[in-house]
């Protein structure tokens, strides 16, 4: 009888261990999914912000080309644009991407930095009329 009781205790302990392992595995999987979802949402928000910032940049450029705003108004807007763009790019550093996506995030950040540099060169051209700045801006934009 003692042998059967010990055997039942061992079986119960193994069953509890198996159930505990399954629960821990499922919990770990859920946490990983939640972190991945959060990362995806944060990355999507950054990309959306960059798209909005660039849309406004080109909208103001068009207004200036069409004569709807002055050069001074354009440059004032571009000063704000540059600050917003830099702030948004810095948010890439706050991301905690899964290892699989680290290189992709790095490439997205480099792309945004290149776009910012293109914008800075364009602004330099607007300020000074230096055609080489315009050419650099166009070259960076094509990258």
Indicate residue ranges for each PLM-predicted region.
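N-terminal Sec-pathway targeting helices
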Residues: 1-18, 22-26
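Serine/threonine-rich low-complexity intrinsically disordered regions
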Residues: 1-5, 30, 70, 130
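Juxtamembrane loop-transmembrane helix junctions in multi-pass integral membrane proteins
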Residues: 2, 32-35, 97-100
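Short, well-ordered helical secondary-structure segments
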Residues: 12, 26, 30, 79-84
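Ser/Thr/Pro/Gly-rich low-complexity linker/stalk segments immediately outside membranes or between
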Residues: 25-45
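Alpha-helical segments in soluble extracytoplasmic regions
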Residues: 38-143
């Amino acid at each position: 009888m003692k042998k059967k009781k010990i055997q039942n205790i061992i079986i119960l302990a193994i069953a509890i261990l198996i159930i505990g392992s399954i629960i821990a595995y499922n919990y770990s999987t859920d946490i990983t999914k939640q972190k991945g979802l959060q990362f995806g949402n944060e990355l999507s928000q950054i990309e959306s912000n960059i798209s909005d910032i660039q849309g406004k940049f080109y909208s103001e450029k068009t207004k200036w080309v069409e004569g709807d705003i002055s050069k001074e108004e354009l440059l004032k807007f571009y000063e704000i644009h540059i600050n917003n763009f830099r702030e948004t790019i810095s948010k890439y550093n706050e991301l905690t991407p899964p290892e699989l996506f680290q290189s992709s995030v790095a490439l997205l950040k480099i792309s945004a930095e290149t776009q910012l540099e293109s914008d800075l060169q364009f602004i330099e051209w607007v300020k000074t009329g230096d055609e080489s700045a315009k050419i650099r801006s166009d070259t960076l934009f094509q990258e």
